[in-house]
């Protein structure tokens, strides 16, 4: 009996302890949730101030220099592992649908040669151009090891090498379009590509996609406008979706925005698709 009574007493004591512990635990959890929300808000605000300051102050050429520094130092984009990896799944399906095998393709922003190599392996006559000297050199080393000619040439940022209309299709390298600052430069870039292609040629563009009215994009945009006014910074217009991410300029788009820029450059939109946060569009030259 004594043992039974002691057990009941201990159980009651443990129950009281548990009941006293639960409110304290709940209080700590609530405190954590509150602190975490405010920490994240402060982080977003600090990030918006940082991105907005530089977006409002740096002009398009300076943003290009920031982006170039990122890609010039990239070991990933220069690596044989990346450049010999072939097409992404979405690239393969789009190319099979809109591009005729055996046709002549120009790749803009060809990097270390991934798209050019994959296209040539798939039976296309492909060549490209790139503005990063280290990436062009990396492509030359890869082509040399494969016993191939050097199919990637150097070109200035946001420019297209001049020449005759000889290409049957155009490919803007993986997310290259998303790193070109200002709508005017992007449209001029597309027009330059159009001038190298035969009428009716397909164009593939990939980019970072966004939904309209994303709060972080709006916050960064407003902050950039404030700093531009305060510092009398860049003269080019600022756009919602302009960001600085991983030490490079990044522009994210809605499909409607991409379609409008293609139309301004003389392409009609033929197909939209998405792969996670990546969007891609096929335009047809008119």
What are the residue ranges of the model-derived segments?
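Core SAM-dependent methyltransferase catalytic element
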Residues: 271-286
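A short SAM/SAH-binding and catalytic strip from SAM-dependent methyltransferases
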Residues: 169-184
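Conserved class I S-adenosyl-L-methionine
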Residues: 25-100, 102-111
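A short acidic, Gly/Pro-enriched loop at the edge of an enzyme's catalytic core
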Residues: 161-170
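SAM-dependent methyltransferase
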Residues: 205-261
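Class I SAM-dependent methyltransferase SAM/SAH-binding core
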Residues: 112-159
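A short glycine-rich, Lys/Arg-flanked "PGG" loop and its adjoining helix->strand segment in the class I
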Residues: 187-199
């Amino acid at each position: 009996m004594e043992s039974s009574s002691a057990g009941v007493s201990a159980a009651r004591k443990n129950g009281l302890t548990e009941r006293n512990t639960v409110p304290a635990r709940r209080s700590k959890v609530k405190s954590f949730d509150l602190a975490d929300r405010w920490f994240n808000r402060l982080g977003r605000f600090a990030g918006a101030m940082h991105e907005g300051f530089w977006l409002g102050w740096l002009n398009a050429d300076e943003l290009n220099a920031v982006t170039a520094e990122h890609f010039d130092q990239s070991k990933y984009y220069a690596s044989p592992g990346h450049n010999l990896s072939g097409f992404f799944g979405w690239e393969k399906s789009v190319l099979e649908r809109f591009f005729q095998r055996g046709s002549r393709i120009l790749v803009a922003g060809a990097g270390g040669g991934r798209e050019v190599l994959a296209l040539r392996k798939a039976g296309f006559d492909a060549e490209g151009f790139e503005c990063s000297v280290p990436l062009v050199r990396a492509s030359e080393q890869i082509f040399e090891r494969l016993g191939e000619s050097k199919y990637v040439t150097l070109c200035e940022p946001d420019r297209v090498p001049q020449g005759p209309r000889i290409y049957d299709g155009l490919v803007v390298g993986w997310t290259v379009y998303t790193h070109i600052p200002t709508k005017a430069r992007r449209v001029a870039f597309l027009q330059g590509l159009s001038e190298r292609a035969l009428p009716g040629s397909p164009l593939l563009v990939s980019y970072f996609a966004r939904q309209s009215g994303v709060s972080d994009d709006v916050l960064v945009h407003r902050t950039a406008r404030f700093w531009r006014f305060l510092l009398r910074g860049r003269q080019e217009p600022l756009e919602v979706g302009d960001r600085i991410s991983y030490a490079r300029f990044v522009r994210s788009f809605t499909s409607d925005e991409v379609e409008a820029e293609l139309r301004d450059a003389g392409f009609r939109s033929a197909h939209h698709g998405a792969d996670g946060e990546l969007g891609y569009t096929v335009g047809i030259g008119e």
